[in-house]
């Protein structure tokens, strides 16, 4: 039997105070995956455009067509560098549309860009593109990862192994699958059933395939019970990220239609993870997608909102702010309207 670890939730919410700042004014970017490579901060975002697709059903207006790489020498740098287009939709043989939130991992001097896109049948798959430099350009593999589905890949290195996390509801199509197999028709669990979970799989040595079948990640309440589908304030929706702090594993994600960024804590990459609280209250705009990174012994939250576009959900701008822990290791909640 797996031992379940539980934590006492906050009796009072403590708030981090440092003001956030925008990172790039010239174009709209979102979903930033931040990493430090060669002592430089690299951002791997999605690239928002004012698309001709106006129907927001299932995220159709998030119609991204390429990826850029951005970089900073340090957090306080006034101008974020745009390395330009590093991968285009037309250069991905299997992909039809919608280059959503990516992530990058480094292994043995090579850089692997993991990205979701819809194939010719309209199903999201996860692809890989490779470069010899963190700033790209990247060359896509001819086919998506076998057995992949849904959106929002995030890759995590732990003890020399690389794990990929993924999944997203609604437009992210996670409801279309059970036990890694497609359903004849998408089916949401009812409110009293267990919520759908983000997925995890060990990556192969060449970083291009799953080394195992994806597994569900359990997210538990304070009593050790899986969060329910009707618990929209806490259950997983999309945008999973993982980091470690003081030998604990912090799984963070968006709650979707309640627009919160929240987290859970566990003791290994597979979990289970016990829900702890909010990292960020709702921002301007529908989506919340982030990364959490340690830089020069300080922790930062990278994320986006839609304030500069006047609240247009599909035109988002990147932000960064300092992330703080209290003395017990809980993350201090931040105000998304700052």
Describe the predicted segments one by one:
Residues 1-2, 39:
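Generic cytosolic/nucleocytoplasmic N-terminal low-complexity/intrinsically disordered segments
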